[in-house]
A protein has these predicted regions:
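A conserved mid-domain beta-alpha-beta active-site/ligand-binding segment of alpha/beta enzyme cores
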Residues: 154-210
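A structural signal for short, hydrophobic/glycine-enriched beta-strand patches
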Residues: 1-167
């Protein structure tokens, strides 16, 4: 792969993953995906006592509808139990198919929740940060992700090309979704827009908003 493509994609990855963190709270909300390392990180935080419960949310999405025959949340739950989490400390939400639904469905499940850390993939941190204020204004939410390096440690489920496609699509959503009421507005720096335009010119367009 061309070195400039990797450079531009790394720029997107690092920007989208910035600002993540966690603190003691009421629940760890796990936004499921194709990357089970998010489940592993949730188990690590749970063992450290960050929160007394895991709320795992996700049905299937673009990347997992052909990967597993059961909802993502059930796959992640099995992973958490295998890592020693007490099943009684896990709640499931199996309807959500995107970040907005992850948050709104968990809100319906536990409306009393006020402080939580939402876990996702590193390249999805910004998307979740921008979606939270729209879907759950009263939530004191933090967003965190496992420490995964691009490009060397990307998921082999989708590979480097798939992750670049995903990030290009995420930037597209950051630009378009505020007008649709899905996310809060966010001013992307010129260098991020330039990286996005370059990657689109290299035909990383499979995940753009349709």
């Amino acid at each position: 792969m061309h070195s400039q493509t990797i450079e531009m994609a790394t720029r997107l990855w690092e920007y989208m993953a910035a600002g993540r963190g966690h603190a003691p709270c009421e629940a760890i909300v796990v936004c499921c995906s194709y990357d089970l390392r998010v489940a592993d990180y949730a188990c690590e935080l749970f063992r450290r006592g960050i929160a007394p419960q895991l709320i795992i949310t996700g049905n299937t999405g673009n990347w997992t509808k052909h990967l597993w025959s059961i909802p993502e949340a059930e796959v992640f739950r099995e992973r958490a139990i295998a890592h020693g989490v007490d099943p009684a400390a896990i709640r499931l939400e199996t309807e959500a198919t995107n970040f907005g639904e992850n948050i709104s469905c968990v809100r319906r499940l536990v409306p009393e929740l006020r402080r939580a850390v939402f876990l996702t993939k590193p390249n999805s941190v910004l998307r979740v940060q921008l979606t939270l204020p729209v879907q759950w204004p009263e939530m004191q939410g933090m967003v965190d992700a496992p420490a995964i390096r691009f490009p060397d440690e990307v998921s082999n489920v989708v590979g480097i090309l798939g992750v670049i496609d995903e990030m290009v699509g995420d930037v597209d959503r950051i630009l378009r979704y505020p007008q649709r009421g899905y996310q809060t507005a966010h001013n992307l720096p010129a260098e991020i827009i330039a990286a996005w335009e370059y990657l689109k010119s290299q035909r990383f367009t499979n995940h753009l908003v349709r």
